[in-house]
Amino acid sequence: MKAVKYQSSKKLVTMALIQISNQSTKSLSKKATIRFTQSICPDCNMILDAEVFERDDQVFMSKVCPTHGECEELYFGSYDMYKKFSTYWVDGKGAHAPNVMMEDKCSCPNNCGLCTNHLSHSGLANIIVTNRCDLTCWYCFFYVKKGLEGAYMYEPTQDQVRAMMKTLRAERPIPGNSMQITGGEPMLREDITDLIKIMKEEHVDHIQMNTNGIRHALDPEAGRDVRMAGCNNLYLSFDGVTARTNPKNHWEIPYALDTCRKIGTTVVFVPTVIKSINDHELGGIIRYAQKNMDVVHAVNFQPVSLTGRMGKTEREKYRITIPDCIQRIEEQTQGQITVDDWYPVPSCMPLTNVIEAFSSKPKYELSIHFACGAGTYIFEDADTKKFVPMTRFCDLQGMLELFEDKSEQIRSGANKYFTMLEVVRKLKGFIDKDKQPAGLDLAKMFSTILMKRSFDSMGSFHVKGMFLGMMHFQDKYNEDLERLQRCDIHYVTPDLRIIPFCAFNVIPEWYRDRIQKKYSITVEEWEEREGEKLEDGLYRGLMRRGAGDDLAAGCAKSQMFHEASQATT
């Protein structure tokens, strides 16, 4: 305590100031500014200056709204990984969407569609074909709920879908060529095969479906129809290996996988990772995917995006970032997959650059922000069945440096044919053949990619190995406009715009909800038109009944419970 004196108009006043000790980490720990960016207020969406800083070996974001005060949020769980990943920060060639022209300065994220500030073309476009779902998950904010005030049914017509495909294909310099059908549950659309055929007619080559897999489990022929129409991959929700962590489709997953085996559809497991809910099962998810590698070619973890109003304590309970997930995977795979095996998504840009320099044509690139996503490839040792990450037998860093160096030489005027032959000749030097999994010839695969100037030969890579990915979509608490402007996962909409994921879903009142409501009808109108009730499409848990039934949880056919117990040990 110390005394402070000041002179009032009448007399000298002495006040005692009590020094209140704040023992919080925030006060005692020093912070170091990394960079400045812009974000939004989670309460009013005002665009704010934001500071990204390091404290206690973690990366945080802080912003102050003049009305709603300061918001501080965990941005990246490891400063060391942030530094490593940031070395791959590159800008793409941009995207010129045909229907949105901004003559003056853009006020990002106010004018998404895409605007001239955007730095990445559409790597994967999403189209929402319905907001109906056959499940009623308590935590889901998206599906249409009958009886809810203002409830509407959003299902774009076939003509609207075709127009959206034309818009995507008109994007330059890289026409959109990869589409994800999403919802709701897309399989509820009776005309889903017609929609897929429209996409193929408009020259969209790669089509995958974001689904819970229940319809594939219940009706294999419906799955076959979708496959024959042109959808060759399922982006399959899979949040854990136990019924507690994955009540959504735990019992149905084995049957959905059986259907995919029979019809020739590949699968990507998509776990939404929530701290304190299912982050203890990440290793188990990978092991269950390993048991089904004949059909499951990837696992793409998505650290949760926190929607709605949440206090800081509640956010800290559930918030998990890419480095946190990667660290848990190392622990839960007993060090078979380590934190050093992961690279940020834009690390593959040198390969794109050398192909582009050789072909003298713009090529598909993954130029997203380094903090958006990460990945690694793993293989299975034939003898021990342990995981073998690609980094164990490939000097990936050296190979990327070679690609970047040779692309610069070609752009500087070197003979591109001689240069590419030199690249191919040197590839073998980066690969340890003794440690390379049997049946895999990585040097040959990269040589084919380079000489054919195409990624088509990557297919054999997926068959022999499994991709592990991370994609952390933003929310209002951690929105970073540096990331948003580099986003390459987009939505196509009936008003013929192409909108980045982290604008479309992060600010739904500006984008997703406003657009869908404009092109919707009431639930009652839909029921009258279709001659059915909305609740008729709900899944009644047919594969979960009867303790001794083959279709019951933990059925002998799939041995799901047995495999789940193995996966968690």
Residue ranges and their predicted role:
Residues 2-123, 135, 486, 490-505:
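Flexible, acidic/Gly-rich N-terminal and inter-domain linker regions that tether
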Residues 162-180, 189-303:
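Radical SAM/AdoMet-radical enzyme domain recognition
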